[in-house]
């Protein structure tokens, strides 16, 4: 993700690669092993709004106790935190986000939560996708985006998953999609993707969705879960906009989208 961001940093904003680090803990592991040059490059891309980082170390079940929540919000050194410009707390796939977490986000001056409930294991108390203000007992509040789970983004441009499997052998016996396998940018494929998108958006409108925008999370189609970035996505977005399709597409971090 860092290399893709660096490669496109001098492009116009809509043609830059963007990536949201889904959990703070693996980022901390990367940071501890990275060279000083790589750390500086990462901070440059964070400043350039091409990389954003989740305030939460993991996607966490809702039953942690007070001591555990305190530890999770003191996960990295304070001087490191101050450099990362963290704007949002994310909770995807693991359902349940308690007030204990929300108040600690506010204590860190973070006012956004991005969620994607797994519909196989629960349901949303509000219509998805959509936003609402979550007010705390002390009158502080956060803006919550209750979005689709991360595998849904691809399905706004394709009839079905390219591959959806989570198997122990995935790392060694399958490969991530290569150029030409997925999100093809020839005219026929682009028009097909446009037709799928228009149908999905029409369905949303008929169900009452009235926002003038839609934000989607987008995962790779290698293992779907915990995947790396998909380089083909940026070329697809660029071609889409060049063809004049509406709505226009933008690749943004979660913080920028909020």
Regions found by a protein language model. Give the residues of each.
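Catalytic-domain carbohydrate-binding cleft regions of carbohydrate-active enzymes
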Residues: 1-258
